[in-house]
Swiss-Prot record:
Molecular function in Gene Ontology: ATP binding
The protein's name: Putative protein p41
Record domain Helicase ATP-binding: where: 14-186
A Pfam family assignment: SNF2-rel_dom
This protein's encoding gene: 41
Species: Acyrthosiphon pisum secondary endosymbiont phage 1
Coiled coil location: none
Domain of life the protein comes from: Viruses
Lineage of origin: Viruses, Duplodnaviria, Heunggongvirae, Uroviricota, Caudoviricetes
SMART domains from the UniProt entry: DEXDc
Length: 460
């Protein structure tokens, strides 16, 4: 366990959550929202200000791994046990019986089930809605089933509420009413959605269409944030980070059980070979190809480059990153061709960085929301900095030069040269307890691959 030293902006989050019972925290990825929120909960439990368990609503991956892992990381959170309520109905019911846990996590898809099964015995005093934009579609009538179920207990049975997101209004101000209702039951933005739109929007009837759209009135962009300001903490990374250095963020994902079994079988073969004879330096990386492919999510099944998908854990993680980016274009580094095929299928609006010069132009003009690039195609002289400041490593490989080159394409120096006063975020999607972690170690230490593999073998 590590010793937690809050950064200045994390102190702001902690104090905000302690001071205001129902509130919003708007802060981007990499700003430590999870650790700060757990720290605030720890303070509330220690002081006796909170005695009931807490429920965290989150996407599946975040509920399953992010919150439990964060609690295990820091020594000051040793008294907080995080229990995910995931899996089969039987597993979820068993999880609810954990009397030692003070924090429970559940994915949004299981909200209706949870509210139904608990009924009048609802035990949670605090709800934390992670990636709270999932609540934007709530309406008092004709809303989604999940938010409707949540609305039944949000104000009647819950006395503390936190909306966490880096992008509160990815599609415009219309996204705010549903989230805000869970904080104050419509006190600030209107008791109903119609009241909200009538006050701050004008309806535009489209010629020849039966439906219309809303456009915010001129004063809406000022008045709506102002109306929420007393219960909202909004943090901009550019105000807190040194924009001269990239901000690295590791996003761990768990391999599903079947994928883990497949991975262990392939890893065992590699380590047997390592134990039988010394692998030459040039051959060491090649021996890890299949294992790293499994960590990424698919594997070639024959010599014709046909492939089989093993899991989609990294796809889910990338979805969260894209949602958190709030419309800011994202550059995604992949390694395997099957990575690219899976990415293009999962994100139809994404585009591969090909040889067509128009692709590069469109990216730098903000016309491509997701650009998939192999690091080998991002050598010297390629300018990607105008298109965005977010880079995601979807899969991992040993080549340090290629790794450094793609970072440099949108890195702080390029951003400054182009006149962009903004930090660069680099997200590494890493499969836990796999060679992904060893590749990450090589990037940090620049040690020989075969030495790192031998060390990894000894740890097993």
């Amino acid at each position: 366990m590590k010793t937690f030293t809050p950064r200045p902006y994390q102190h702001l989050i902690i104090n905000h959550l302690l001071d205001i019972k129902r509130s919003n925290v708007w802060a981007g990825m990499g700003m430590g929202k999870t650790a700060a929120t757990l720290t605030a909960l720890e303070n509330l439990y220690l002081s006796g200000s909170e005695t009931k368990p807490t429920l965290v609503l989150a996407p599946l991956r975040v509920a399953q791994s992010t919150w439990p892992d964060e609690a295990l990381k820091w020594s000051h959170l040793r008294n907080i046990e995080v229990q995910p309520i995931i899996g089969s109905a039987k597993a979820r019911i068993a999880a609810l019986k954990n009397t030692h846990a003070s924090v429970f996590t559940v994915n949004y898809d299981n909200l209706v089930w949870l509210v139904d099964i608990l009924g009048d015995t609802w035990p949670f005093g605090t709800i934390i809605a992670d990636e709270s934009t999932r609540l934007k579609s709530f309406r008092l009538r004709k809303g989604g089933k999940r938010t409707a179920a949540l609305a039944k207990i949000a104000h009647k049975s819950v006395h503390r509420w936190v909306n966490l997101t880096g992008t509160p209004s990815p599609n415009g101000l219309m996204d705010l009413w549903g989230q805000a209702w869970f904080v104050d039951q419509g006190e600030r933005l209107g008791r109903t959605y119609n009241a909200f739109t009538s006050r701050w929007f004008k309806r535009i009837q489209l010629p020849g269409q039966q439906w219309s759209r809303f456009e915010p009135l001129g004063f809406a962009h000022l008045q709506i944030p102002l109306a929420l300001s007393d219960v909202t903490l909004s943090l901009d990374a550019a105000d807190w980070f040194d924009i001269d250095e990239p901000i690295h963020n590791v996003i761990n994902v768990e391999l599903p059980a079947k994928a883990r079994a497949h991975y262990h079988a392939m890893e065992k073969e590699l380590f047997l070979e390592l134990g039988e004879s010394a692998i030459e330096a040039l051959n060491a990386a090649a021996k890890t190809i299949k294992i790293l492919q499994i960590a990424s999510g698919a594997i070639y099944s024959d010599d014709n480059r046909n492939w089989t998908e093993i899991h989609d854990a990294k796809i889910q993680a990338l979805e969260s990153i894209v949602n958190e980016s709030g419309g800011t274009p994202v550059l995604v580094a992949y390694h395997w061709k099957h990575d690219l095929e899976r990415l293009l299928k999962a994100f139809p609006k994404g585009k591969n960085l090909d040889a067509n010069p128009r692709t590069l132009t469109d990216w730098n003009n903000g016309k491509i929301p997701l650009l998939f690039a192999h690091p080998a195609s991002c050598g010297h002289g390629l300018n990607l900095q105008d298109g965005g400041n977010i880079l995601v490593f979807f899969s991992h490989w040993w080549d340090l030069e290629q790794y450094q080159q793609i970072i440099e394409r949108i890195g702080p120096t390029r951003q400054a040269q182009a006149g962009h006063n903004r930090p660069v975020f680099i997200h590494h999607i890493v499969a836990k307890d796999t060679l992904d972690e060893v590749v990450m170690e090589r990037r940090n230490s620049k040690r020989a691959i075969q030495d790192l593999l031998l060390e990894a073998m000894k740890r097993k």
